[in-house]
A protein has these predicted regions:
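A cross-family signal for N-terminal binding/gating loops and helix N-caps
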Residues: 2-222
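The feature marks the mature, well-folded catalytic cores of soluble enzymes
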Residues: 221-514
Length: 514
């Protein structure tokens, strides 16, 4: 654990020569450490970091909103607005002088040697979540009223604590401008603290660029996962004699009932791929619906495909489920909760008319979801209108969370090893251990048209329903799932006729917690 404290001290050692990219990288690394590895202890009570903001000024990072101060690193500091900061190393000259009115003053000299800043604690939550300190003033209350003559063991201090894998999102800092205040008037007011400073216009421009920087880090609530769900819904189209698979539907519903899961029926659907148009459940009381306009329906060369698009608002009517909405275009199958993250393929960029790796859009996506997103690469192989082409780009065809920091990945690497390696590398960068399902070196003639679908299984609580196809890979896939989910009951169902259409059990179902 001491290694974590040593690393934290190193990261906190910002200085006057660091460039903006280095500083921003430090912000992110420090936030991750504070959320995952530290807490504030006051007496016997432990508080976890819920929301923090970063401020730092040097000649390469002129964040003029930062309060000037003298300090060594890792000192608590009550700022000018009554909030509490955790300081970075801070040095700035101060001297006597005469202001514009001829009055004697003792003010700061802001020059290229100056550097200062800290981390504003904006929100804390007790470890049992019973006590939330919301706002800088409330957080600073922890540091008030301590004994003047005796050593006070209740004074707050940082402690190492393993908080597990924590998700967070970045947002712009709050209250940098108030009311009708302009950038110029705000900066001019700040410059009143200084006897001398760099060019005023340059600082106006700097503030303009910094005011929307996403230097506020917000810890996310825990995502709901399949292991916590207890209800399953299916579309009645699945049992349609003409367009569905009635025999499979009967076998599936019987299997679910044998697992003590009573399947329920969705209304007003237009096809049986329920996952893609139904809302994602983020936690027990929060659902998010999105714009469902997938290119594989709307841009298909078969005009009838567009007519099968389901509007989930109609489906939800009468279900007693309240949703918030986003205008972003998303497919439900392209959102796989993995620990604190939602894993999506980069197809979400193109569906929303954005360039891949557009950082502004990714920030918007995370803000709308309220959770951090891991983007994995996806590439379409084959002709868009060919029946056997994966034109969907759904992450539920690639990965599944197994609990903790473990992810089970499908057998994409059998056909496209470089693409699979890129996905695995990204997931490992976020702290996950990845197990890939592989069949190419274990069976003579692998059925690539079917064996991709094992990863698209359905999990409800501790029950797993996995697809099988009466092929050699079935037993190998069962072993992968058994090792990844040792505490789950694993049941199997033959469904080649569905998988050949490009989806499997996760695609045709909608499981939630009620």
């Amino acid at each position: 654990m001491m290694m974590i404290t040593t690393k934290f001290k190193e990261l906190m050692s910002l200085n006057g020569e660091m460039n903006a990219a280095e500083i921003e990288s430090r912000f992110t690394q420090i936030a991750k450490l504070l959320f995952e590895n530290f807490a504030i202890q006051k007496g016997e009570k432990i508080y976890l970091f819920k929301e923090i903001e970063f401020y730092f000024y040097n000649k390469h990072h002129r964040d003029i909103i930062t309060h000037p101060r003298f300090s060594d690193s890792l000192y608590w500091y009550v700022n000018d607005f009554g909030g509490i900061d955790l300081n970075f190393p801070s040095e700035i000259c101060k001297k006597d002088g005469i202001d514009s009115t001829g009055k004697k003053v003792d003010k700061y000299i802001l020059d290229d040697s100056s550097y200062f800043g800290g981390i504003l604690i904006r929100q804390l939550v007790s470890e049992d979540k019973s006590d939330i300190l919301e706002g800088p003033w409330a957080c600073a209350e922890l540091f008030r009223l301590h004994h003047a003559l005796e050593q006070d063991n209740n004074f707050p201090f940082l402690v190492e604590r393993n908080n597990g894998m924590i998700g967070y999102i970045c947002k712009p800092r709050l209250n940098l401008l108030t009311g009708k205040q302009t950038i110029e008037s705000k900066v001019d007011y700040i410059l009143g603290e200084y006897l001398s400073h760099p060019d005023r216009t340059e600082l106006h421009e700097a503030f303009s660029s910094f005011k929307d920087k996403r230097y506020r880090y917000v810890r996310c609530d825990q995502l709901l996962h399949d292991s916590e769900t207890n209800e399953v819904y299916l579309s009645p189209w699945l049992k349609d004699k003409k367009d569905g698979h009635p025999e499979f539907y009967q076998r599936l519903t019987n299997l679910l009932k044998n697992c003590d899961i009573e399947p329920k029926e969705l209304k007003c659907t237009r096809d049986y791929w329920a996952r893609d148009y139904m809302p994602i459940q983020l936690n027990e009381n929060e659902f998010l619906k999105y714009q469902y306009y997938p290119d594989y329906l709307m841009k298909s060369n078969n005009p009838e495909d567009a007519e099968t698009r389901t509007e989930c608002t109609n489906v939800l009517r009468g279900m007693g489920i309240n949703c918030r909405s986003t205008k972003l275009i998303i497919d439900g199958g392209n959102m796989v909760p993995c620990g604190p993250y939602i894993v999506m393929t980069d197809k979400v960029f193109t569906e929303n008319g954005k360039e891949k790796e557009d950082t502004v859009f990714k920030a918007e996506l995370e803000s709308e979801l309220g959770h951090p997103v891991i983007i994995i690469p996806w590439k379409m192989h084959g002709d868009f209108n060919a029946r056997d082409t994966d034109k969907y780009g759904h992450s539920d065809g690639f990965v599944k969370w197994c609990g903790g920091n473990s992810i089970l990945m499908g057998n994409h690497g059998d056909q496209y090893p470089e693409e699979a390696a890129a996905i695995r590398h990204i997931l490992k960068k976020y702290g996950f251990e990845v197990t890939e399902m592989r069949f190419a070196n274990k069976v003579g003639s692998p059925r690539t048209d079917l064996n991709w679908a094992y990863i698209n299984f359905l999990q409800v609580g501790n029950k797993i329903i996995m697809p099988i196809f009466n092929i050699n890979e079935d037993a190998i896939a069962w072993q992968y799932l058994h090792e990844a989910f040792p505490d789950c009951e694993i049941h199997q169902i033959e469904m080649a006729e569905v998988a050949e259409e490009g989806g499997a059990l996760h695609c045709i179902s909608w499981n939630i917690r009620r």
